[in-house]
Amino acid sequence: MDRPAREHLKFSKANTKNEIREMRIYKDDTADGLCFSEINVGCTSTTPKMSLSDYFSSVSCSFDGEMRIPDIPLKMYGDLHFHEQFTNDVDLDLLCWQLLSSNQDSRALCVNILRMVTSLSLGNAFISEGRYHYAIDTTEQTSAEDSDALRFLARIAKIVIKNDVDKSDVVAAQQTLIYYYFGNSYQGIHLNWDSKSSQQSIHGYSTSEVCLDHYIRMKVDLFHGLRSKNLVYGGNYQLVYQALFYYYVITNGRFSSGFNVRKDSIKSYFVPNDDPSMCNVSPRKPSLSLMFIRAVLITILIKDYSPVKEIPKYLRQLEVENPLTNSCLITDNGLRSEVPMNAAAPSAPTPTELPVFSPPSS
């Protein structure tokens, strides 16, 4: 059985944690002795051909002191809508990857996300099996899980468009990500990537984000991760969430490179980082808002495999929009009941100064 055929069978994905223990192991055709679920992370002629676990074998992490659990700010913009509809079909998994990727035009992408919300609310689009389809007056139904996942994406899209995030917001989001990933709240972490690992010398790899970018884009169902609980990737699902966390750190963390700044030589990263100019990304340097929403997005993706049992704040309160009337309600603490955003909000805000709505008091 060839790799593409196996990739979509039940052997390469398990639906529950219990199935992992009984899952059959299939060898990857591209390298002897590698489990299929680890895959080969080499994506260019200059990147290593090794399994994901080997790629992570030389990574060490050290921690700064413990701290109180950070309070990530809840940002909502109830009057920010785009009335134009999005008329193309799109793979939402690819859309999520573009939001995470360091070399995508994320701001333009965020406008399209809000256009999708408008189309969906007008009954001119639906989401099925992770794809957005535009269809005027469609009778197809979109599940609540798909709708909530798109609402979450719309929330972070508004944050990118508004671009009023400050450095303290970014630090809080990154420390929250650390808290969810490790289960303890630390002031910061240092990620060190030692290229002098036990692998053969021909593997002389660096921490270039290209390998993890390729792995996440090709192998991880990001949108399904947003909408589905207990989505498990093969027998080594921990590596998927490790890859997501490392990818954020090496693309949005502060790097140190020793004597030169060649990307190939970068070995050490630190988060929290509140300086976009110090991020290891190319060709576009991220803004503070992109650093913020990517930390929130990764936190949501790893939530079901985190030792932290609390539901992240950005999933507890989702905006329910009606672009036709420029109105917006929110779900209260994850319940389906809807609460007005802010009864005292001005009815006609100026175009240059959109109000920031606060969540209702509990």
Swiss-Prot record:
It holds the Pfam family DUF1101. Residues 341-362 are annotated as: Disordered. This is Probable non-structural 41.0 kDa protein. It comes from Maize rough dwarf virus (MRDV).
